[in-house]
């Protein structure tokens, strides 16, 4: 059986304790690999290796030299595309058609985009008068923040991990990555690519394990970690924030959400259905930017519900190797239990189950997988659990509205504010409503269109800070002002 070890100081090493845990294929419930669980000793070794690497060749390289190496990392991912694809789909169960189009290409792009971006960032400079008349010049320089603790999620493992590692390394930092215990494969595989690309030992380190009383907690509590970036649940973010408060270390969080979509009667209904199908059901609904609440203007409500129902029922459920499949399992049986508990809550609270609401019949060899049906509800009160709480599954509640102001109020009614979608052909309305929505990202007549130069992050309880483009540089560097008297 495959054995996944930590990657520390340029080498794959096991845990001194010998403790391991199972990595399970969510499509069939079979064990893929045994993964070493890091203790405090392994986490400390990784952090110290990262700290030492800051003073080694990596810390002495120019921006262009680092960029050249990161381009080789990106090329290494592309050269081993099929290996990364197989590993990502084994860990997540997602269709290969999805991972080959989004996850793996973006994993490579995250290194190239940020390497090139940093090469072209201008610095500010100001002349000033001085009391003696000689003058002075102020100019700003960016310096690496230091050792970055990266805690990445399981839904888009390679994409979201490299989204943090790419800019962190481009800025000259070193990293210690704690991937989700559910999806360790591509993070480990990236260690091999880093070695081959000539990344110095200690620059990229990986420790495997869980959160509380395990690698995640040990990493966030470590005093030699200079900053922490995390994607995951709001509750976990709160715990990390408490740990980071000791030492007053900066954090960047992308947290939970309960994203809303607003569909106006003047929309292009074909596009609204296609976009909503993706935003609700893509990746099994396990997308932080996905839509779990849809507000549809009353004149088109019935038609919209009927067409989204037909779309949900047309999804082909299957394994990553099924070329026809476009809907895979959830990440784990544990997560399935959570999602199914909300399916039951919806019924208990009086929902009309438009479609789904249970577990699909699967062949015997897949019976151990974490399968659920795509699900749509209507008829619930605005305060119902499935309307107000993040489920992170392939489901949504659809509610009619009559006035624009009502739709905005409903969309803004929760303590989350990550993303939103608007479907309308009225340009003035699109701009007006987008400006009123309390969300970090608003898509108009689209979903998941991403330009990596733009700001990414959530408002309210959906996050702290922004990453993407120069915003990533603001988090991963310290800005120093130098004043020179003439």
UniProtKB/Swiss-Prot annotation:
Gene3D superfamilies according to UniProt: Aldehyde Dehydrogenase, Chain A, domain 1 (3.40.605.10), Aldehyde Dehydrogenase, Chain A, domain 2 (3.40.309.10)
Among the GO molecular function terms of this UniProt record, one is: oxidoreductase activity, acting on the aldehyde or oxo group of donors, NAD or NADP as acceptor
Which residues act catalytically here?
A: 254, 288
InterPro entries referenced in this protein's UniProt entry, alphabetically: Ald_DH/histidinol_DH, Ald_DH_C, Ald_DH_CS_CYS, Ald_DH_CS_GLU, Ald_DH_N, Aldehyde_DH_dom, OHmuconic_semiald_DH
Catalyzes what? (2Z,4E)-2-hydroxy-6-oxohexa-2,4-dienoate + NAD(+) + H2O = (2Z,4E)-2-hydroxyhexa-2,4-dienedioate + NADH + 2 H(+)
Annotated keywords: Aromatic hydrocarbons catabolism, NAD, Oxidoreductase, Plasmid
Q: In which pathway does it act?
A: Aromatic compound metabolism; benzoate degradation via hydroxylation
Entry superkingdom = Bacteria
UniProt-listed GO biological process terms:
benzoate catabolic process via hydroxylation
Q: Name the Enzyme Commission number(s) assigned to this protein.
A: 1.2.1.85
Instruction: Please name the top-level EC class of this enzyme.
Output: oxidoreductase
Which NCBIfam families does the annotation name?
OH_muco_semi_DH
The UniProt similarity line reads: Belongs to the aldehyde dehydrogenase family.
What function is annotated for this protein? 2-hydroxymuconic acid semialdehyde can be converted to 2-hydroxypent-2,4-dienoate either directly by the action of 2-hydroxymuconic semialdehyde hydrolase (HMSH) or by the action of three sequential enzymes, the first of which is HMSD.
Q: What is this protein identified as?
A: 2-hydroxymuconic semialdehyde dehydrogenase
């Amino acid at each position: 059986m495959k054995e996944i070890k930590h990657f520390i100081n340029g080498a794959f090493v096991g845990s001194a304790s010998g403790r391991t845990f199972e990595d399970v294929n969510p499509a069939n419930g079979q064990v893929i690999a045994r993964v070493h669980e890091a203790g405090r000793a392994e986490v400390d070794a990784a952090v110290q290796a990262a700290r030492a690497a800051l003073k080694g060749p990596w810390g002495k390289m120019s921006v262009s030299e680092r960029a050249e190496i990161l381009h080789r990392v990106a090329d290494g991912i592309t050269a081993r595309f099929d290996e990364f694809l197989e590993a990502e789909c084994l860990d997540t169960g997602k269709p290969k058609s999805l991972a080959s189009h989004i996850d793996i290409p973006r994993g490579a792009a995250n290194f190239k985009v940020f390497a090139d971006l940093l090469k072209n960032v201008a610095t500010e400079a100001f002349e000033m008068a001085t009391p003696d008349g000689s003058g002075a010049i102020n100019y700003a320089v960016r310096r690496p923040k230091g050792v970055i603790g990266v805690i990445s999620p399981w839904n888009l493992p390679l994409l979201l991990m490299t989204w943090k590692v790419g800019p962190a390394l481009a800025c000259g930092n070193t990293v210690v990555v704690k991937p989700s215990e559910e999806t360790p494969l591509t993070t480990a595989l990236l260690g091999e690519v880093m070695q081959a690309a000539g990344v110095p030992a200690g620059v990229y380190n990986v420790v495997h394990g869980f959160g509380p009383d395990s690698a995640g907690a040990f990493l966030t509590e470590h005093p030699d970690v200079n900053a922490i970036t995390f994607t995951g649940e709001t509750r976990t973010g709160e715990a990390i924030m408490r740990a980071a408060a000791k030492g007053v270390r900066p954090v960047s969080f992308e947290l939970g959400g309960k994203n809303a979509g607003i569909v106006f009667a003047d929309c292009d209904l074909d596009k609204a259905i296609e976009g909503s199908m993706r935003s609700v059901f893509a990746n099994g609904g396990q997308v932080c930017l996905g839509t779990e609440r849809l507000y549809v203007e009353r004149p088109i409500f019935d038609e919209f519900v009927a067409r989204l129902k037909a779309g949900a029922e047309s999804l082909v459920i299957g394994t990553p190797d099924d070329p026809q499949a476009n809907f895979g399992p959830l990440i784990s049986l544990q997560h399935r239990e959570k999602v199914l508990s909300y399916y039951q809550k919806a019924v208990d609270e009086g929902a009309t189950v438009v479609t789904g609401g249970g577990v699909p019949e699967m062949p015997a060899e897949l019976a151990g997988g974490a399968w659920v049906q795509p699900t749509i509800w209507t008829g619930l009160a605005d305060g119902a659990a499935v309307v107000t709480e993040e489920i992170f599954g392939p489901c949504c509640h659809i509610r009619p509205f009559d006035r624009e102001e009502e739709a905005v109020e409903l969309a803004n009614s929760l303590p989350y504010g990550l993303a939103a979608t608007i479907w309308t052909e009225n340009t003035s309305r699109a701009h007006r409503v987008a400006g009123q929505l309390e969300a970090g990202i608003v898509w108009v007549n689209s979903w998941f269109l991403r330009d990596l130069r733009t700001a990414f992050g959530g408002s309210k309880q959906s996050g702290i800070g922004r990453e993407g483009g120069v915003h990533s540089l603001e988090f991963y560097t310290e800005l120093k002002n130098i004043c020179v008297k003439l």
